[in-house]
């Protein structure tokens, strides 16, 4: 339990705020992804590449994550497992455009807004 508290909870607090967990503009069937274990991942901030990696770089493999989570929760078709991002943190400020790409899945574009603007 300590591991989960310390390893996963900070990411959940940062990346899963109410109304602020954008996932993808597309739903892609598994048949459209030839190798989910080696998809390119990229993040751009204002057009500048800030993160780059692949799903092969994940700390835990996709089959391991599915097996691990299945031990204590029921996974259903269509469920999403959030794993984090490639190395390279990037500060963003209101007005910045963040683009995230997953090879074969698509590209998600978001603009950062202030809390006051979001209300």
Please name every model-derived segment.
Residues 1-72, 88-119:
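Catalytic-core "active-site belt" of small-molecule-metabolizing enzymes
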């Amino acid at each position: 339990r300590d591991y989960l508290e310390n390893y996963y909870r900070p990411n959940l607090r940062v990346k899963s705020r109410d109304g602020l967990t954008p996932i993808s503009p597309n739903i892609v069937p598994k048949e459209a992804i030839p190798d989910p274990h080696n998809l390119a991942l990229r993040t751009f901030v204002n057009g500048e590449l800030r993160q780059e990696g692949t799903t092969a770089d994940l700390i835990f493999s996709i089959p391991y994550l599915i097996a691990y989570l299945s031990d204590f929760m029921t996974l259903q078709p269509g469920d999403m497992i959030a794993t984090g991002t490639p190395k390279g943190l990037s500060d963003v400020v209101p007005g910045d455009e963040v683009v995230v790409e997953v090879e074969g899945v698509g590209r998600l574009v978001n603009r950062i807004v202030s809390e006051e603007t979001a209300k």
